[in-house]
């Protein structure tokens, strides 16, 4: 489906590419880069064929536009004429044609739902699909605001039969506080399960329950202070969000419903939500990799779960470009630092700067105090995989090390059964090794941790392992304590590294349940 053209970052073999999916790319003609596409969209040329009109499109009308020179695609209810984009799409024309004349939302989400198609294709917008309203007509009645019971029409048949129990919410107040209570009916809820944003009068609380998302989204009836608190009662799955009133007056209602309020739908069907975060520091880690520190707004509660990634969004030459990155800790020894503010308001990223890239040079040019939009977390790593684990093996190449940082820290800190954590870290040269001294210090401090560095282009002075990922290296590295010991192997790097590694691990008789590949 729709993809950012070939000059985009991460490149097809980059270890920072999160959602590669193994798709093949088609070489683009000269003059068909992302910059060329942006120039075309800014040229004033009519790319829709409708001379600036927006129309309502029926299913019958959409089906008629299914040819390469007349191709309309629907994404999340909006219809685009992608015919002009055909030659600019690195996945090739055939990939786009899979959704010609139809709703391409599912195909789009399977490959790269993170791409900001609204910005990329805004000059190709034909109009909206003609469809019935998603919410019942009486949805905006005040009783729906006061009582957080989920309307039956919001629960799909599939969800009712197979998904988790439907959550609900309620609220109560004192003279100075308003407390919103979300009843998840799940016991594995914690602080990173809920994301809260308050902007102007808009209040948004999204709770992730397995593969579903429950949303409380209202325009508050009165003003509140910027800061709030979030509490989770884990054994009953109750979330309490405590807001501070600006004035000690009684509220007659919580507020008025906003888009998708009180909905409980598969997470894959939700759009990405962003908030602006401030760049507070940027420091060199290697010759081409930097540690970026972003600060969340005080009106946001967001904790990125272990093994998950977020999307960074920047406006570049008038178009919003989005790229996925996995947050890390600020250090492998964070406990020795004295934070100025609570740790959970900062998000850290190890990012390799590509001088010829499209995104990272712009990111690198940001000044302290500038803003970057950060999305809600995504990812399919399940932290319960680490429970009762005896041996954890980490295979990382380059910046494929980033998802390993939090996994490593969490395992050493929280898994009592853990016997050994071993990291095999592949790089080109010694200068490319991220946090080498920290890794060596950690291995000295905690005897459960071992690290091996493997270089593909070492100097003559290098005495460590050399080469690329191979069956011989892996069979020597991956030693089980016993045939019955519980192990997990995590793998992340450029696409060829990951694909080869997966095949080698299967050939070494490790089961699918014992392997996690960070490719989203």
UniProtKB/Swiss-Prot annotation:
Keyword flag Amino-acid biosynthesis: no
One term under GO cellular component: perinuclear region of cytoplasm
Domain CS: 164-255
Residues with PTM N-acetylmethionine: 1
Binding site for heme: 89, 112
Role this protein plays: NADH-cytochrome b5 reductase involved in endoplasmic reticulum stress response pathway. Plays a critical role in protecting pancreatic beta-cells against oxidant stress, possibly by protecting the cell from excess buildup of reactive oxygen species (ROS).
Protein name: Cytochrome b5 reductase 4
Organism: Bos taurus (Bovine)
Gene: CYB5R4
